[in-house]
Design a protein with these regions (language model features):
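A mature extracytoplasmic/lumenal domain signature
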Residues: 16, 42, 51-53, 92, ...
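Intrinsically disordered, low-complexity segments enriched in small/polar residues
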Residues: 13, 23, 31, 55-57, ...
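A short, surface-exposed beta-strand/turn
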Residues: 45-69
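Exposed beta-strand-loop-beta-strand "reactive/processing" segments of non-cytosolic proteins
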Residues: 8-51
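Short, non-transmembrane alpha-helical segments in secretory-pathway proteins
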Residues: 1-16, 73-78
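Metal-dependent nuclease catalytic core centered on acidic motifs
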Residues: 60-186
Length: 187
């Protein structure tokens, strides 16, 4: 945790041995490992960290760690931001970050979507673990998954690494997506 979140301190709430840890690729799914419940002393966000068994690009398998801190923090900040049009996206079961989901049917215009996404991005980037260029952000991104009446359209990155994301860049990206997918918003 110190490697990925160097500006924070954590405490172990509980730990347990688990059988059949999460695995990926052709790796065996009958390995055992450990799961810990952790709390951040800085954000008071509670999350889990656990062993997983992953396939490498070389056909070998290895133990790794999975934590859902960024996702748990995003869930808290979505609730604090208090806009029901934004929700957590949990489509990727082994993700080292959190993503958000919006549906275009909940908005009146592309400008409104862009403004809400940009304001939320500004809000969560002012909080731990998203302040500054944290090491974990360089390995992952925070994406907004955009839907149109429950049909997936595409996703856009809200992460500032490796480029700066502005209100204008979000607006341009959403406009292009909607033109490409022939999506119009209600008047």
């Amino acid at each position: 945790l110190k490697e990925y979140y160097p500006n924070e301190s954590f405490e172990i709430v509980s730990g347990e041995k688990i059988d059949n840890i999460k695995s990926s690729g052709s790796c065996s799914d009958n390995k055992s490992g450990y799961r810990y419940t952790i709390v951040s002393n800085d954000t008071n966000v509670q999350f889990t960290i656990e062993d997983i068994y992953e396939a490498s690009g070389y056909g070998t398998c290895y133990y790794s760690l999975y934590d859902n801190y960024a996702q748990a923090a995003l869930e808290k900040y979505i609730a604090d931001f208090n806009d029901s049009r934004i929700s957590i996206y949990t489509g990727d079961p082994i993700s080292f970050h959190g993503d958000i989901k919006i549906d275009s049917k909940d908005f009146k215009s592309i400008d409104e979507i862009s403004s809400v996404l940009y304001n939320f991005k500004t809000y969560y980037e002012s909080k731990q673990p998203f302040i500054g260029e944290q090491p974990f952000i360089k390995e992952s991104s925070i994406d907004a998954f955009i839907w149109n009446s429950e049909n997936f359209v595409s996703s856009i990155s809200l992460s500032y690494f490796p480029r700066e994301i502005t209100l204008d860049s979000i607006n341009q990206e959403i406009t292009s997506l909607f033109v490409e997918h022939n999506i119009t918003l209600p008047a």
